[in-house]
Amino acid sequence: ENAKFFLGHFPIFLYNNAMAEQEEQFFKRRALTEAGAAYSVGAVLPVLASLLIGFIAALAAGEGYSSAAWYRFLAYLLPQICFAAAAIVFFRRSKVSVRGVYRGCRWYYFPVALLLQFGLMFSLSELNNLFVGFLESFGYTNQTTPLPPLDGWYLLPALLIIAVLPAIFEETLFRGILVGRMSASGWGTAATLLISGALFSLFHGNPAQTIYQFICGVCFALLVVRAGSILPSMAAHFANNALIVILTSTGYGTEGGWVMPQAWNIGLIVSSAVCLAASLVFLLFLDKSNARKGGVRDGKYFFFAAAVGIAVCAVQWIVVLITGFTA
């Protein structure tokens, strides 16, 4: 009797199981497609918004609008608003859980994140300075976006716009959505790190920082994959940007400002390199959490949706490169 019941219901069980697998696969592909679309939205929307705001500002404030304090703050705020919009669209369309993106992790990933960021900020940036010098030897002029005023009470909104908001919204887009969907779709760890790092670097559109941003993107993605959470990378991102803002506000590295003594600078670079090496040894060799071998499963869905954003970022990168050599 039990055998007849089992044989009679076994086909139904197989059918239901197959349908559940198909639904899960459809959800993963849809979420991966929406992640690619989020990258495109995050790349295109700031360009369109900045052109519109620049046009309106030029009409209202005249030619000198770009040097005004309010416009410099707005130039840093606008991309974060666009990233937030891209994330909202993603969560609404993909049905991915917001809580899943911001879930917690083991406590020790936070000190690892800070050590990693300390290593990236000083030792790796020193290597990036050498790369910039190499480009400048061929006549390249490195163009940087000027910071808003940092004196007095300006420091508080600067920390909010330059440190807090990017730590939330950039990490949500690049690590929470992109890295999260790549991992959830069965991409191999190496593929996830390299592709997300390349997209992160290309997105910033600065040829002089291409290698630096790529390595940072790979390291942040590795941290997120191991931790299973973007919270440690958010903490590292905030620490990096906040320290830059605070140091710059004191005059460090600015024209006419103070310069760190050479002995201090050497000690800082060496200690930073040690921290970077130690954190990478832990994340690469001692911690194997969420490690996965494999390629780019269903990658065509992601890249098709991300193609517009990749094209826009590539054009910006090329324009900046040409401008740097012709300026």
What are these regions (language model features)?
Residues A61, Y65-Y71, S97-P166, G180, ...:
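Juxtamembrane helix-loop-helix connectors linking adjacent transmembrane helices
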Residues A85-C105, A198-I215:
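Cytoplasmic juxtamembrane interface segments
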Residues A43-L48, P111-S125, V225, A235:
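Hydrophobic alpha-helical membrane-insertion segments
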Residues K4-V101, I244-A327:
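N-terminal, membrane-interfacial amphipathic/helix-forming hydrophobic leader that caps
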Residues A37-V41, V112-L116, I161-I162, S196-L199:
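Alpha-helical transmembrane segments of MFS and MFS-like solute carriers/permeases
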Residues F26-A31, A35, G64-R72, V101-Y109, ...:
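Membrane-helix interfacial "entry" motifs
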